Amino acid sequence: NIWRDRFNFPILYQRHNENIGPDRNYLSAVNMGTGDYCWIFGSDDILTKNSLALMEDKLAAGSDIYLCDRRELDISMTKISNPHRRWLNGGSRLFSFSNEADLIEYFSKCNSVGGLFSYLSSIIVKRNKWSDVIFDESYIGTAYAHVYILL
């Protein structure tokens, strides 16, 4: 409720009574959403100061997917410095995956699987685009069902 009062985001939190597995958990999270965008945020991750305000500005551009970088922290919340582990080479940039040249350039800039949407808490997706994908149930159990939908 604190976030709802400060930002124009309909933030929802749900914890299932039993473990339904990662893939069904991701799918359930987006299905319960009612806003234009979904940020499936892991329970062991934290938002940095001003991240909601920053994303509120970025979402105004209307892109389908936003991939945020992350900070790695130890158990005492001290930043771990691993500059080689950024998702992508280069700064912020808009890529159109419907453009083959952009897609190839995007993949060539990926430093790790994080750039391929593996780290869920770094992904914000337009909910209607996610919902438009006909999901292949054979991806349940991979822990990467969301990557099928995003790519």
Name each region found by the language model.
Residues N1-L151:
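Nucleotide-sugar donor-binding/catalytic module of glycosyltransferases
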